Regions:
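Electropositive phosphate-/nucleotide-binding environments in soluble metabolic enzymes
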Residues: 69, 73-76, 108, 179, ...
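Short, small-residue-enriched loops and turns at beta-alpha junctions
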Residues: 132, 202-206, 231-232, 258-259
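Structural beta-alpha unit
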Residues: 40-43, 73, 81-124, 219-250, ...
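Short beta->alpha connector loops
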Residues: 12-13, 107-111, 131-132, 175-176, ...
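Small/aliphatic-rich secondary-structure junction motif
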Residues: 1-61, 146, 156, 164-229
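Hydrophobic/aromatic beta-strand patches that form the interior of the parallel beta-sheet core
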Residues: 34-36, 104, 125, 152, ...
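Gly/Ser-rich helix-loop-strand patches that form or flank binding pockets
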Residues: 15, 19, 26, 111-161, ...
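A short acidic, glycine-rich active-site loop
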Residues: 57-74
Length: 284
């Protein structure tokens, strides 16, 4: 069951949408959303390789700190507004049976903040990377490769999702990553109204999709199996079949091949990351 959700934010304008997804889950599971803002150190904003006088350096440090204070204050107020909008209680700690949210502020690199807080989160919510603006890729990578926890990639939406984790699709290929994805999201699967296993039936040296269906049925999951013909564009096929069955969330193992290989040469995970229009829970 999802009890603690981490939401790393950085003032890039994507926080509201991701919070809408996290809030929807918090209300559904009575969970606690930790909104973690990574505040850059003023020293890191200094011009690199340029000699500046001590008075100018002091002035720049002061101005950087003031700007950071303004950003933090604005984001705190935005969180308060969003919490009220979604009916979530502001609380530094989780309250059993109540959807809550808290704000934390830390200095340093965002990857370190994600490591520290993500490793004890049931789910990490991040924005879908914006390739055109070069935003979000490092956040997704940090969450996937440095925490060992499930990561929900949230697509950009104009409003909160009407359904989330209600009809869940599983992209199954019998791999260790896929197995881990199922194991780490059992709480989601057991609470879903419907689960559809999507598979080509080509699980080489891995557990087959029929065995996964039986495994989930033994846990009381309402699950069905959909096999489709294998092609060289598995990522595209997964998304098409998600739309076909009406799934609102996809769960899959992430980057069975290396991230660099998939990014350069293409792969199922990278296609889904680039093209998905529904939330995707990824596990590496």
């Amino acid at each position: 069951m999802i009890r603690k959700i981490l939401l790393p934010v950085r003032g890039d304008g994507k926080g509201d949408n991701v919070f809408a997804h996290a809030a929807t889950l918090a209300v559904r599971y009575k969970g606690h959303v930790v909104v973690a803002h990574c505040r850059p150190r003023a020293e890191d904003l200094m011009p690199y390789g340029i000699a500046i006088s001590a008075p100018l350096r002091k002035l720049l440090l002061s101005q950087s700190a003031n700007v950071a204070d303004q950003v933090e204050d604005g984001m705190r107020k935005e969180l308060e507004s969003l919490a009220a909008r979604f009916g979530i209680t502001l609380s530094d700690k989780a309250i059993p049976g109540v959807a809550t949210t808290a704000w934390i502020e830390e200095q340093g690199r965002q990857v370190d903040v994600i490591k520290r807080h993500g490793r004890l989160a049931d789910l990490i919510c991040v924005a879908k990377p914006d390739v055109d603006r070069n935003l979000g890729t490092n956040t997704l990578k940090a969450a996937l490769f440095n925490t060992g926890r499930p990561v929900m990639m949230c697509p950009p939406l104009d409003s909160a999702p009407e359904r989330l984790c209600d009809h869940v699709a599983i992209g199954w290929n019998g791999s260790v990553e896929a197995s881990r994805a199922v194991a780490m999201t059992l709480g989601v699967l057991e609470e879903a109204s419907e689960v559809t296993v999507l598979s080509t039936g080509a699980e080489v040296n891995g557990a087959d999709s029929e065995s996964l269906k039986e495994y989930l049925q033994a846990r009381g999951v309402n699950v069905k199996l959909l096999r489709f013909k294998s092609s060289r564009k598995i990522g595209r096929d997964l998304l098409q079949h998600c739309a076909q069955v009406g799934a609102d969330t996809l769960i899959m193992g992430a980057y069975s091949n290396s991230h660099e290989t998939e990014t350069v040469f293409g792969g199922a995970t990278q296609y889904v990351v680039d093209h998905s229009g529904i939330p995707v829970i990824l596990v590496h």
